[in-house]
């Protein structure tokens, strides 16, 4: 069998997925739950449907949560007790990586040898755990960063706290150690290479997706009626965690500027999400900002919505705004477009991939209030243009499905398995990090394998 055939045939039977700081079962849009939660759960479900057992390890955050939950057929969530259930900020979680890792290793030790074929870690905290489990279990590590400290710190919102140096150091360690890196976009792959010295040959670009069976166009009037919104009022919606990084204040300020220019204009700003992060993190702060700007009666706040209600938010809106200072991709943009709603987004990170500028929405450079007000007014003032954009948005979003993401992950897993075990067996050159070299040397000694 040649090398290509061997690589194609390499496929995991069971994988360990690490999501230390947030559970895939948590409600997106509040706390530390967001797009990554959706990503972890949806890809796990798709992989399970392809015959791969998925076990997700996450930190337990409440005493009533059972140790193991079945998220879907073939998908288990293992809730690991590491530190107090409540009151532990994400910035404090590095102190709990040791007990978390210990419990993950203990759970694997109760199984037969070779229980997991591969580890996939999400976010840098999980990567630190993944690096150790990879060496202990002698299986490849695939890592997805989701966000990068160096990128976030280069585009901080006013008043936002920078990511600590310790995180950037941790990210560099993981990137050096991972067998494969999964980047959401080509832009993220470039950032990994240029900012972190990643090996481009070990990066796989696999775009996230959306649940296209759920997020699809529907009756706007019915959606507005369900949400208690006026039938004829232009609506621009923001969906996400209320934190400086996501910049909901940029939308509120732009709306206020638009109304200052034209006080008689009809406009509704719909904010859907809950508190997170630091600085501008409470809905109350955004409510106070709207009051200061004199547009309180034009802004409606809703808590985070489950998927069956969230699709109605997208359908109800004429436009969805994603004004983030940094985004590795932007799932909200794809979900909105799949629902037939154009997107007004910041021209940052993966949003230039998620949104086709001028076709399915508009990208705004920078976060100046006047620029956002101009773009907002231009789109809301041209109903025909919005309608055409909405049609193109659906077609564009059709290229982003979780099924497609899962297939991309399987290709990355296949490459990781082939390189990892091929290096052991002498098939191909393989690519080994220092820790891999040490662990594989130990494996050779134990198994009596000679070079």
Swiss-Prot record:
Top EC category: transferase
Catalytic activity, EC: 2.4.1.250
Alphabetical GO biological process terms: mycothiol biosynthetic process
Keywords: Glycosyltransferase, Magnesium, Metal-binding, Transferase
Keyword GTP-binding: no
Binding-site positions, 1D-myo-inositol 3-phosphate: 21, 32-37, 90, 123, 147, 167
Family: Belongs to the glycosyltransferase group 1 family. MshA subfamily.
Assembly mode: Homodimer.
PANTHER family per UniProt: D-INOSITOL 3-PHOSPHATE GLYCOSYLTRANSFERASE, GLYCOSYLTRANSFERASE
General function of this protein: Catalyzes the transfer of a N-acetyl-glucosamine moiety to 1D-myo-inositol 3-phosphate to produce 1D-myo-inositol 2-acetamido-2-deoxy-glucopyranoside 3-phosphate in the mycothiol biosynthesis pathway.
Name of the protein in its database record: D-inositol 3-phosphate glycosyltransferase
Annotated gene: mshA
């Amino acid at each position: 069998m040649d090398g290509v055939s061997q690589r194609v045939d390499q496929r995991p039977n069971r994988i360990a997925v690490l999501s230390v700081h947030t559970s895939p079962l948590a409600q997106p849009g509040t706390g530390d739950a967001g797009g990554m939660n959706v990503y972890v759960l949806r890809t796990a479900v798709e992989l399970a449907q392809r015959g791969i057992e998925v076990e997700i390890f996450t930190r337990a955050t409440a005493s009533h949560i059972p140790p193991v939950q079945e998220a879907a057929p073939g998908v288990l969530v293992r809730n690991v007790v590491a530190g107090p259930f409540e009151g532990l900020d994400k910035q404090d979680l590095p102190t709990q990586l040791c007990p978390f890792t210990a419990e993950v290793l203990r759970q694997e030790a109760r199984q037969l040898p070779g229980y997991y074929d591969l580890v996939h870690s999400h976010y840098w905290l999980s990567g630190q755990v993944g690096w150790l489990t990879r060496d202990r279990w002698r299986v490849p590590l695939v890592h997805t960063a989701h966000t990068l400290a160096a990128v976030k710190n280069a585009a901080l919102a006013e008043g936002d706290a920078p990511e600590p140096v310790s995180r950037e150091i941790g990210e560099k360690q993981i990137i050096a150690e991972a067998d494969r890196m999964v980047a959401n976009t080509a832009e993220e792959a470039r950032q990994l290479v240029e900012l972190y010295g990643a090996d481009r040959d070990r990066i796989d670009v696999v775009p996230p997706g959306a649940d296209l069976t759920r997020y699809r166009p529907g009756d706007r009037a019915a959606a507005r009626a369900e949400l208690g919104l006026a039938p004829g009022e232009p609506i621009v919606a923001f969906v996400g965690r209320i934190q400086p990084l996501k910049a909901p204040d940029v939308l509120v300020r732009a709306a206020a500027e638009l109304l200052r220019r034209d006080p008689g204009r009809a406009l509704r700003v719909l904010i859907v999400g809950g508190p997170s992060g630091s600085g501008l993190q409470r809905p109350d702060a955004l409510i106070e900002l709207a009051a200061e700007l004199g547009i309180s009666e034009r802004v409606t706040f809703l808590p985070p919505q489950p998927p069956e209600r969230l699709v109605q938010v997208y359908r109800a809106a004429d436009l969805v705004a994603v004004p983030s200072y940094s985004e590795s991709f932007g799932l909200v943009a794809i979900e909105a477009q799949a629902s037939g709603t154009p997107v007004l987004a910041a021209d940052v990170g993966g949003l230039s991939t998620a949104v086709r500028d001028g076709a399915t929405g508009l990208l705004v450079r920078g976060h100046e209030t006047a620029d956002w007000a101009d773009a907002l007014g231009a789109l809301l003032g041209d109903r025909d243009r919005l309608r055409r954009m909405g049609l193109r948005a659906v077609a564009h979003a059709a290229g982003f499905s979780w099924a497609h993401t899962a297939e991309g992950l399987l290709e990355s897993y296949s490459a990781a398995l082939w390189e990892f075990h091929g290096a052991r067996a002498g098939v191909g050159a393989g690519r080994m990090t220092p820790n891999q070299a040490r662990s594989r040397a130990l494996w050779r000694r134990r198994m009596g394998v000679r070079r």
